[in-house]
């Protein structure tokens, strides 16, 4: 018998670490249950954090005082800002990470956390009392009483590795799957399915001909993920770049019937946006090559991750096709690539708080909800951990709007639409991406963290100072101004309309930069770099943001129009039975969510609104009669 906890988090991966940390920061007495303490923070697949859309999530996790941004900065060995030449709204920070440094940094963060206890072992079942979560039952029979549970099982629920025709029960290489919890979720009546993901072979970098491959360098001036990181201290390395060849493709095509994915033995659906090399050859057969990034797994590690050739072909076929790739002709394979399929829960079973609708006190986060990626998992973990703590303390949950964060976009997509394949974050999923940028994540979400009670003192002080600097510099930029005639004398092209324009307004002009304006106003050279960057981007988007603000107001109004938990969607007489069934399954909590259910039309929304207004009027009349 263990001591009682407010929150028990099952799983020590990226979702579990963030969930445990968020619950503990909020003040909940928290337990993190994991198979092995030393496996906390392990990067199971690619050794990288961030990217397009994903980098936004990492910045948002950091703005909420989560762990991933700081840990990535401590472990990053090749920082790059993707889409640097495009607009700020779609830029994506990314870094290669040293696997060992990442794991060690995450474990340091977890070990230093107050209110957090690590319990090693295998969680086997969840005990219920009056239809609510009451305890976690361990495989050894011991019991952990608790007020809420966050389940972050990753690929461990009935996990099955495939290498050709070989099947290995495992959550990841060398670790057994979780069978008991999968049975528990089925017993509790949750809708479940199977998904698949894959990973490439690991190569011995000492056997690669590095002179035969191209190189990709890190950015000269690396940009950290975390607001709290001043400088990146690790040496920055290069990655290799090579391509598959027609010879590679022929070997794959000739043996594709041996692939676990093409032989019919895998029932799970894989991620469309991270296809296996078999999928690439099948879907894009006209191409003569596919790019491969040779990514070192650490500063002191000769293991290479060949990003772009995940596969479930037999090991001997993998060796054959890999050795037809330039630079890899003599390579030694340290571990074959494989596919892994696992159970997941239909995320439409969840509320926006990530609590199960049918099981009060049970929260789910990460791949169990049908997502793929460390960043998606970490963001869900933070939300689930915080809301589990709020639930355990009988407080209202915190919901994230899709108008204020990529986290909100992801959770709304999952809980209102569900998934047919592993869900990955992209900037294109966010309607309001002009306002959801990586540069303003702190401005958007750190006040949310402060209000929720999960913001550390050091970050709070630094953020307060940053806001003060921002206000001062913004005022200066709006104070400094110039007339069209003065601008013409100084070589600045403005409309000759007689109106003075401030520096802040000038930054909205195409190709007008703070650096160029500093030639005319030298005081702009003395600005803090981060403050200057935020304000330059803010000013350049100001006109567009004004236009978008009306749409955001409309969305927030619809989010405020709540749908009662017991609302009878079958009573919507003007809707098709198919649409009623979709609404019953999705159980939208507000009009904004209902509008995103597949098949909903403006006419259907009008019917729903009319019935809600009628119900509100009826309840008001009943209240008056009882007074």
From Swiss-Prot:
GO terms, biological process: tRNA methylation; tRNA wobble uridine modification
Cofactor: FAD
Keywords: Cytoplasm, FAD, Flavoprotein, NAD, tRNA processing
HAMAP family (alphabetical): MnmG_GidA
Residues annotated to bind FAD: 11-16
Recorded GO CC terms: cytosol
Protein's job: NAD-binding protein involved in the addition of a carboxymethylaminomethyl (cmnm) group at the wobble position (U34) of certain tRNAs, forming tRNA-cmnm(5)s(2)U34.
Source domain of life: Bacteria
Keyword Aminoacyl-tRNA synthetase (UniProt): no
Lineage of the species this protein comes from: Bacteria, Pseudomonadati, Pseudomonadota, Alphaproteobacteria, Hyphomicrobiales
A GO term for molecular function: flavin adenine dinucleotide binding
Organism encoding this protein: Agrobacterium fabrum (strain C58 / ATCC 33970) (Agrobacterium tumefaciens (strain C58))
Family in the record: Belongs to the MnmG family.
Subunit field text: Homodimer. Heterotetramer of two MnmE and two MnmG subunits.
Residues reported in the UniProt entry to bind NAD(+): 270-284
Subcellular location: Cytoplasm
Main location: cytoplasm
Annotated protein name in UniProt: tRNA uridine 5-carboxymethylaminomethyl modification enzyme MnmG
């Amino acid at each position: 018998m263990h001591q009682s906890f407010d929150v028990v988090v099952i799983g020590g991966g990226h979702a579990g670490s963030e969930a445990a940390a968020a619950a503990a920061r909020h003040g909940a007495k928290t337990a993190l249950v994991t198979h092995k303490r030393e496996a906390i923070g392990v990067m199971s697949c690619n050794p990288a954090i961030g990217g397009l859309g994903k980098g936004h999530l990492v910045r948002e996790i950091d703005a909420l005082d989560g762990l991933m941004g700081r840990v990535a900065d401590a472990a990053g060995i090749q920082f790059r800002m993707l889409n640097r030449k495009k607009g700020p709204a779609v830029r994506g920070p990314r870094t290669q990470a040293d696997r060992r440094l990442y794991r060690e940094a995450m474990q340091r963060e977890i070990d230093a956390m107050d209110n957090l206890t690590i319990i090693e072992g295998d969680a086997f079942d969840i005990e219920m009392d009056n239809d609510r979560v009451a305890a976690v039952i361990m495989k050894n029979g011991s019991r952990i009483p608790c007020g809420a549970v966050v389940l972050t099982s990753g690929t461990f629920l009935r996990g099955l590795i495939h290498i050709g025709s070989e099947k290995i029960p495992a959550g990841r290489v060398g670790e057994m799957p979780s069978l008991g919890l999968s049975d528990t979720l089925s017993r509790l009546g949750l809708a479940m399915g199977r998904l698949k993901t894959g990973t490439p072979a690991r190569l011995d970098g000492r056997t690669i001909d590095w002179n035969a491959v191209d190189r990709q360098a890190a950015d000269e001036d690396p940009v950290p993920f975390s607001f709290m990181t001043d400088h990146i201290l690790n040496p920055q390395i290069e990655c290799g770049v090579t391509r598959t060849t027609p010879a590679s493709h022929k070997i794959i095509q000739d043996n594709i019937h041996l692939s676990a994915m093409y032989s019919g033995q895998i029932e799970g659906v894989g991620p469309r946006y991270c296809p296996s090399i078999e999928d690439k050859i099948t879907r894009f057969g006209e191409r003569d090559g596919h790019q491969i990034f040779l990514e070192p797994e650490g500063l002191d590690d000769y293991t290479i991750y060949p990003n772009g050739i995940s596969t479930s072909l037999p090991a001997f076929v993998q060796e054959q096709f890999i050795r037809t790739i330039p630079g890899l002709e003599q390579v030694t394979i340290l571990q074959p690539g494989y596919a892994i399929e696992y159970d997941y829960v239909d995320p439409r079973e969840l509320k926006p708080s990530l609590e199960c609708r049918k099981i009060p006190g049970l929260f789910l986060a990460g791949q169990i909800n049908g997502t793929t990626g460390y960043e998606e998992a970490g963001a869900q973990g933070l939300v689930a951990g915080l809301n589990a703590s709020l639930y355990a303390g009988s407080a209202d949950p915190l919901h994230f709007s899709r108008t204020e964060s990529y986290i909100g976009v992801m959770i709304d997509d999952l809980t209102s639409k569900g998934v047919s394949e592993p869900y990955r974050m992209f900037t294109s999923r966010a309607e309001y991406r002009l306002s959801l940028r990586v540069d303003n994540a702190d401005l958007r979400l750190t006040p949310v963290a402060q209000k929720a009670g999960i913001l550390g003192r050091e970050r709070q002080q630094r953020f307060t100072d940053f806001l003060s600097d921002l206000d001062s510099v913004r005022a200066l930029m709006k104070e400094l101004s110039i007339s069209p005639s003065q601008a013409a004398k100084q070589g600045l092209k403005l409309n000759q309309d007689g109106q003075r324009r401030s520096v802040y307004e000038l930054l909205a002009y195409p190709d007008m930069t703070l650096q160029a304006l500093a030639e005319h106003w030298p005081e702009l050279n003395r600005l803090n770099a981060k403050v200057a960057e935020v304000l330059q981007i803010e000013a350049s988007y100001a006109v567009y943001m004004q236009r978008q603000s009306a749409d955001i107001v409309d969305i927030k109004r619809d989010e405020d129009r709540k749908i009662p938990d017991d609302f009878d969607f079958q009573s919507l007489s003007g809707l098709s039975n198919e649409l009623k069934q979709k609404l019953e399954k999705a159980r939208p909590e507000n009009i904004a969510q209902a509008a995103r259910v597949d098949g909903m039309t403006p006419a259907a929304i009008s019917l729903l609104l009319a019935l809600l207004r009628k119900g509100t009027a009826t309840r008001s009349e009943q209240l008056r009669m009882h007074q």
